[in-house]
Amino acid sequence: MVQRTRWRYSAIAHNYNSCRPMELGAGIAVGAWDGVWARARSAEFVAATDMGDPVYSAFMRYDDSAPLHAAVAADWATYVAADFNGGPFKYSIFPILYSFTASLVVTMGLTVIVFFNVRTKPHRGVPKLLRVAAVLACGNLLTFVVRAMMQLGRDHAEGVVPMNHILDMLWTDTAFNTVDILAVLILQLCQVQTVMRFFTRFQEKRLISLCGILLAVLSQVLWAIPPYSEAVSNHFMPLDDDKDMDVLPPFVYLVRIAQAGSYASFVLMHVFAKKKLCVQSVQMFLLTVLTVVVVVLQPAFFITDVTNVWIDNLSEIFSTTCYMGSTVIVWEWSNRLSILEARRQAQSILGRPVYEDEEQGYNFARYALKIQTALTSKSDEGDTTSATTFAAPRSARFEGKGGPQSPVYVQEGEQQAVMAFNKRMGTRALAHHVLDSIIYYTDKVVVKGLGNLSASLPSKTSSATSVRGRVRKRIGLEGANDVFVYRTKDLVFDSDEDIPRT
């Protein structure tokens, strides 16, 4: 059997006499065609082997068939009864075929879910990455299964059913390893985006994005070094006398276990935090249970991979399937959970929480002024006289995709909202801006208690400052620096007994 990773176990040498040339002595050699035979004084027989191990014979045997050679029968009995590196004989070619086909069916099912069930809005990037990773993983696994079946067909035509040849195809195929590493990298990046959705503050999302992307790229680069080194040198490096590469595979495997455990911890933490929404319906409850199973299965598989050598033989296929399942199912669960959470926030009084770092870029100010401008321009088209409407506010409805929304009150007489943002100013304009700011804050702090505000110096930025002041007033930021002094006062109310009765 092919030994790939010496750090997992020590290779045990098995010497089978039937796998070496055997001297048969004198006899008659019968050909494959009728009537073709020859008498031989001595003959040497070389049996077909599976990289040094006996192979399972695909020839039909009957009661009157010639018995096997004594050495062949003894070695085959030893091979079937032994429990060595590859496990007992039950871990032979047929369970491996079942594993290949089962992984292929699961991967194809997840690919169908990605293309037909995963929403592309409001997160457009992750669904596209999921589709690319699903196509790569499914196509790569399908190509390998077809090649394995064709190789088994050729071996069966020769009367043997080997196992190590198929595993050797899995380990030494550079194209398969390249596509697999790329697919797993994309799936890990999608997992980073999934974890980012669990947090609301931008600073937390940036930190998770930075650390997650660096870990994903680093782990995949380190994971790709051993197989590509083996492909370049045309041999399995960890089995040579050079033991420098023995330290890298276990380290990378520990990194993968840590990544899978961290991802599962984040998902389980979010399940616990949103437990009321997770059990809101039967469908959501079942999807939550499936999510917990797939995220726990991934680190459990890596740990089992270390302890069970037979699973190590198929780790490249199993790990890709586990990565795909833990990414696609968790993303779909997160989509449905976000819909339920948005619906609950829309029905509540406070709505969704808004943090200070979300104000970068004036997102909420842009949205508020956009709505106000649309309402003001729409109402001005139907008004013929404005002099009689300056005193009272009016209400207008905003028509959206979901029908008429609640009325928004706009004060008549105000000028149309114009958004003014900080732009790069020249040296002269910057000097005027600094001087105006000094005078403004001096008026606020010193002169406000003595009289009217002093007039600002004329400058080219006075109009921009006034426009910016109107914008701050409309969005409720004009009183941010005001200081108010209060004092308490006792109020005495008449009791019911003091009220005269008639």
From Swiss-Prot:
Function comment: Required for the proteolytic cleavage of the transcription factor RIM101 in response to alkaline ambient pH.
Transmembrane domains' residue ranges:
96-116, 132-152, 166-186, 207-227, 251-271, 284-304, 314-331
**UniProt organism field:** Eremothecium gossypii (strain ATCC 10895 / CBS 109.51 / FGSC 9923 / NRRL Y-1056)
One Gene Ontology BP term is:
cellular response to pH
What residue ranges lie in the Cytoplasmic compartment?
Answer: 117-131, 187-206, 272-283, 332-502
Q: Name one GO cellular component term.
A: plasma membrane
**What name does the UniProt record give this protein?**
pH-response regulator protein palH/RIM21
The entry sums up its family as follows:
Belongs to the palH/RIM21 family.
